[in-house]
């Protein structure tokens, strides 16, 4: 029996193991399951959305039909439909869907932040008066100085008389209108 040389595997044609472009990425079974579960949760979030919100998310016809069907069915059938939606999402690029869903979620947070800023501005208007009015006019040049001063004067009177803050609410509504008309 003849002994093979030690480098006999180096001469095998088509041996591209050292080629870095064809690198195989090993993914564990657990990671695949986690990704599938995450996509199923994304599908469940899509099913929980209303029709108007779904219109704002880029979905193809098959996926949209599956989501609408899942919204109509109940219990065990719904669970199976959610699994189907998860499977459909695995075959698609979900980044645009996630981005659109994040925009929908963040819109509420942005409104809350805006309302807090407007409440703070309203409180400053009532406390500081004309200095804060000048700042409002810098922010929104189309604001009506006379209307703001009148509302501030009424809000101060209501506060001193321990009356309901009707004018303070009107100031907030006016500031909200200014902010909405700007954007």
Curated annotation (Swiss-Prot):
A single BP term in Gene Ontology: assembly of large subunit precursor of preribosome
Q: Does the keyword Cytoplasm apply?
A: yes
Subcellular location, principal: cytoplasm
- Provide the alphabetized UniProt keywords: Cytoplasm, Ribosome biogenesis, RNA-binding, rRNA-binding
Domain of life of the organism encoding this protein: Bacteria
Record has Transmembrane helix as a keyword? no
What Pfam family does this protein match (any one)? DarP
A cellular component term (GO) from this record?
cytosol
Q: What compartments host this protein?
A: Cytoplasm
- In the record, what terms sit under GO molecular function? ribosome binding; rRNA binding
Q: Which CDD domains match?
A: YjgA-like
This molecule's function is given as: Member of a network of 50S ribosomal subunit biogenesis factors which assembles along the 30S-50S interface, preventing incorrect 23S rRNA structures from forming. Promotes peptidyl transferase center (PTC) maturation.
Family, as annotated:
Belongs to the DarP family.
Task: Name it.
Answer: Dual-action ribosomal maturation protein DarP
Question: What is the protein's species of origin?
Answer: Salmonella arizonae (strain ATCC BAA-731 / CDC346-86 / RSK2980)
- Could you read off the lineage of the organism from its UniProt record? Bacteria, Pseudomonadati, Pseudomonadota, Gammaproteobacteria, Enterobacterales
